């Protein structure tokens, strides 16, 4: 997102929200023109280990200005809350490239599996990817709900929970979500959510390891099969 500088030079700074995109490709936005990137550590960059936090990276002078703005002028990065999580933050960053690879394999598998059933998948299983998000066009409300219930049933946390559509604040339609995660709100852990409206797309992201995500995908397909919702079967 270009942001107009308040400096007299009227230079434009390029800022990128890098959530879901870290470690997906061989180069990060700062290597292709971005001046500043930011993201969450309960997404890609935290490797499924960090339980909170975020990061800002890029041009040193801009990072320094951010540090002054977010803490105290003159103190910057020398102060600020780490909440005793430094070990988790650094370990998560260390594991992040591998964990993102597992999430990408999970997305490719889900795309390939459900394209075999005749559903529209974006990206396609063999397409180049810029982030870990996978979408499925499931065509109707019943299929969306069954899919999310199947994903939840294979999750490591709250697998007994049965997701149902509800009026979530901030949305103008009901939403169904599957998120059996160790860290609330984590999207590097496998989750799925869908607004209950046309064109009835589910959005899937994450997967700490491919094997567990594969089981979740198969359980989602099984749930839909039991309800007679799978075409081409």
Protein language model features and the residues they cover:
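Active-site C-terminal subdomain of aminotransferase-like
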Residues: 42-143, 216-233
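Short, solvent-exposed amphipathic alpha-helical segments in soluble enzyme
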Residues: 30-31, 55, 71-72, 150-155
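Conserved active-site segment immediately N-terminal to the catalytic lysine
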Residues: 29-45
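Single conserved hydrophobic/aromatic residue that forms the stacking wall/gate
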Residues: 1-8, 12
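Short acidic loop-to-helix transition motifs that present clustered carboxylates
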Residues: 19-23
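General beta-strand structural signal in soluble alpha/beta enzymes
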Residues: 14-18, 37-40, 123, 159-163
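Conserved C-terminal alpha-helix-loop-beta "cap" of PLP-dependent enzymes
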Residues: 115-126, 130-232
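Buried hydrophobic positions in well-ordered alpha/beta secondary-structure cores of metabolic enzymes
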Residues: 14-17, 29, 54, 134
């Amino acid at each position: 997102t270009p942001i107009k500088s308040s400096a007299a030079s009227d230079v434009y700074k390029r800022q990128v929200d890098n959530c879901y995109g870290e470690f997906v490709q061989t180069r990060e936005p700062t290597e292709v023109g971005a001046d500043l990137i930011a993201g969450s550590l309960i997404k890609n960059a935290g490797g499924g280990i960090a339980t909170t936090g975020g990061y800002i990276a890029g041009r040193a002078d801009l990072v320094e200005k951010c540090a002054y703005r977010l803490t105290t002028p003159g103190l910057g990065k020398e102060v600020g809350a780490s909440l005793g999580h430094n070990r988790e933050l650094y370990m998560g960053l260390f594991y992040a490239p591998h964990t993102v690879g597992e999430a990408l394999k999970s997305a490719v598998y889900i795309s390939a599996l459900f394209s075999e059933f005749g559903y529209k998948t974006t990206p396609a299983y063999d397409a180049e990817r810029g982030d870990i998000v996978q979408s499925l066009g499931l065509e109707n409300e019943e299929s969306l709900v069954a899919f999310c219930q199947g994903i939840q049933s294979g999750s490591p946390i709250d697998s007994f929970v049965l997701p149902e559509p509800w009026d979530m604040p901030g949305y103008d339609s009901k939403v169904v979500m599957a998120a059996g995660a160790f860290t609330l709100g984590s999207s590097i852990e496998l989750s799925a959510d869908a607004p209950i409206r046309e064109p009835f797309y589910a959005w899937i992201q994450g997967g700490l390891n491919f094997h567990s995500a594969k089981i979740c995908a198969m359980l989602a397909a099984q749930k839909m099969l039991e309800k007679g919702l799978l075409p081409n079967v």
